[in-house]
């Protein structure tokens, strides 16, 4: 019983440190640069990175999304072209493995989605499922542009993705106000 009480006391004394280990702010200097440049909340960027790659800069998904923010090569090329971001189109994969480039393009893309849609929820759905898919859902009345009915997102993966990022975003907000 004493061991349990000691464990509980230690947990409460160290919980912020433990939570910050689970929800780190790795690459903070880089995120800060692009958070300011593209006007995207820092804690939202960290929540996306955590969900997408868990801060593994070399992560590659089964769909070939690359790096910290799990960008598809075609999406990265499109975002770079539309926003005058220099990108070596002959070696996009290598470019996306660079943490600076990945965070810049991912944050720029997130900023574009946040401007396009009326809510974080819908922007995050588009980050995961794609703009065309989300626009189709809105046109068909499946979801609203204001994000008030995210439970109606028809793709289970995207529905869970949006909820996970929103949860992680709130945790980041509490840990790093």
Regions found by a protein language model. Give the residues of each.
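Hydrophobic membrane-insertion alpha-helices, especially the h-region
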Residues: 1-14
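Catalytic glycan-binding domains that act on GlcNAc-containing polysaccharides
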Residues: 11-177
């Amino acid at each position: 019983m004493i061991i349990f009480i000691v464990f509980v006391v230690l947990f409460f004394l160290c919980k912020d440190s433990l939570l910050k280990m689970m929800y780190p702010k790795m690459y903070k200097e880089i995120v800060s640069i692009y958070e300011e440049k593209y006007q995207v909340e820092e804690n939202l960027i960290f929540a996306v990175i955590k969900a997408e790659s868990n801060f593994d800069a070399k992560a590659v998904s089964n769909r070939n999304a690359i790096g910290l923010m799990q960008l598809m090569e075609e999406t990265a090329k499109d975002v770079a072209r539309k926003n005058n971001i220099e990108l070596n189109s002959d070696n996009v994969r290598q470019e996306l493995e660079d943490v600076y480039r990945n965070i810049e393009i991912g944050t720029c893309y997130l900023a574009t989605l946040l401007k396009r849609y009326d809510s974080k929820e819908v922007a995050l759905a588009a980050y995961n499922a794609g703009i065309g898919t989300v626009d189709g859902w809105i046109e068909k009345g499946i979801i609203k542009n204001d994000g008030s009915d995210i439970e109606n997102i028809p793709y289970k993966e995207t529905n869970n993705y949006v909820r996970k990022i929103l949860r992680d975003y709130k945790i980041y907000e509490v840990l790093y106000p």
